[in-house]
Amino acid sequence: MSQSNTPLKRKKTENGYSENGSTTGATSNQIRELKRATTVDYVYRDQESKDKIKPLNGFVTPLLTDLYQITMAYSLWKNNRHEIPAVFDLYFRKSPFGGEFTVFAGLEEVIRFVSDFHYTKEEVGFIKEMIPDCEQEFLDYLSKLDSSSVTLYAMKEGSVVFPRVPLLRVEGPMILCQLFETTLLCLVNFASLVATNAARHRLAVGKEKVMLEFGLRRAQGPDGAMSASRYSYLGGADGTSNVLAHCFFGIPIRGTHAHSFITNYSGPDELLDASIKDTNGNVHNLLEMSQKYRDELGYTATNLSELVAFVAYARTFPNGLVALVDTYDTLASGVPNFICVALALHQLGYKAVGIRLDSGDLSYLSKASRKLFKQIGEQFKIDYFEKFSIVASNDLNEPTIIALNRQGHEIDVFAIGTNLVTCQAQPALGCVYKLVEINGSPRIKLSQEANKITLPGRKTAYRLFGSEGHPLVDLLVDDNDMIKDGSKQIPQVGKKVLCLHPFEEQKRVIVTPVQIEKLHHIVFEKGQLTMPLPALNDIREYCFQQISKVREDHLRNSNPTPYKVSVTKELFDTLHNLWLDSVPIKEMK
């Protein structure tokens, strides 16, 4: 199926960045160059997909699914149920990490997947191998299948979302909606989990501090690493150490150096060239200058090979020295050696940046380091010394950061790795994808657990805001009711709205909203995007705006206040009538 590229393009410059400096993603040629030798083409699976937007990850194809999706599709086709119009909701039942909010992420990749959905000749061949007895007519049908008959509704990527509110609503032929299930869940679950984890860490770190994602080496493989860097940035990280994520997504890149850079020096003789030009172009010996300050300050007991390593790095980056100071002893060697080199750089017209703490009592060490910086700054009358950046890394996580805040610290930058990218506190979000309407009739899935019962029918969510500007409740409205008489219209500003708990009728509240936000919008229809894909920086900014509107008690780390997700009286009645009609009546004798 051919389609115009016009509404799908973003502004690009030659280096793949938009004019405002945010990333637009790599160009086709850049991706081809970056992918190196691989059996997966990150750009085109075949010539037919050339005019479409495509998933950024070459593994995201219709075959990235569970086998039973294909076997169900075959059965739907064989029983002539494949073209029946269906509606599916993708949502989650409980927010992660013991919290009350989630950040929705992964929508762009969902749209890319849906837009590019089709089976290549080779993929149809794989299906034939997996189901040898399937009829050729079914394979022919699959080879012509595309997403032109699908309509996709979604909340905005970066939205703060709550349990039971659909993140996506997929409408289309039953066979297509069913074939989407596993892939959509895969694309949304991890993305939203990481973005939420990053947002929670950002709340713990605070607005005034810098938060970096340093998790590449601990991530769950290359694909997990790239997704984690992307969605950590969306949720709150200010930068990443992941070079490829910087190249693909334009995420600000940050880094220091490793302990191996320090320990690879054993003495001054191994620094073959200690020369450095000052800002006027005059040549000096940086090691001799640093040793002079070492003698002057009485730091002669520090590890000399560490000083040599700092000098070597400073020669390379005279305005970018962030020294890792815990290789031997943070306060007895690392910090004093850094000060000596920083003083020498200052004399030459340069400014060191700061230090990184990677072990020990981060609260105590950061405060002791700051005190020493202040003393030296006053002694040499250098104002910026007391403002040196102190970076902390040491297996940080949300509880550790909160504890540091309680203890007090002088940390400026939190470099978070393992616990951010792997979501160690909770490994999965648990989104589900449920059929809620078939051929115009609402459907329900029952369970002994009330929270696993689906909310039937096509629904649109509205966020109702109170007088203080905070959201009070997300209200789910049955779309069929919105076209009926006036008593069943959508909520309106200034008018009282009855909001009911979906399963407990006694839990109800009347809300008079001062502002109403419709949460679901068509993002894909008739084979076309209905709006441009926003840049990652724009999604990130939207996420920050969303979080700033939520009441603090909903966001807090410990015992957050539950957020209300309600239904209208009409949807409540539909739900419970369908519930009663669907449950068999038991007989007793």
Swiss-Prot record:
Reactions it catalyzes: nicotinate + 5-phospho-alpha-D-ribose 1-diphosphate + ATP + H2O = nicotinate beta-D-ribonucleotide + ADP + phosphate + diphosphate
Pathway: Cofactor biosynthesis; NAD(+) biosynthesis; nicotinate D-ribonucleotide from nicotinate: step 1/1
EC number: 6.3.4.21
Listed InterPro entries: Aldolase_TIM, N/Namide_PRibTrfase, NAPRTase_C, NAPRTase_N, Nic_PRibTrfase-Fam, Nic_PRibTrfase_pncB, Nicotinate_pribotase-like_C
Gene Ontology MF, one: nicotinate phosphoribosyltransferase activity
Keyword annotations from UniProtKB, A to Z: Ligase, Magnesium, Manganese, Metal-binding, Phosphoprotein, Pyridine nucleotide biosynthesis, Transferase
Residues involved in 5-phospho-alpha-D-ribose 1-diphosphate binding: 418
Co-factor note (free text): Activity is highest with Mn(2+).
Keyword Magnesium part of the UniProt annotation: yes
One GO term of the biological process aspect: NAD biosynthetic process via the salvage pathway
Physiological role: Catalyzes the first step in the biosynthesis of NAD from nicotinic acid, the ATP-dependent synthesis of beta-nicotinate D-ribonucleotide from nicotinate and 5-phospho-D-ribose 1-phosphate. Helps prevent cellular oxidative stress via its role in NAD biosynthesis.
UniProt-recorded name of the protein: Nicotinate phosphoribosyltransferase
The species this protein was found in: Dictyostelium discoideum
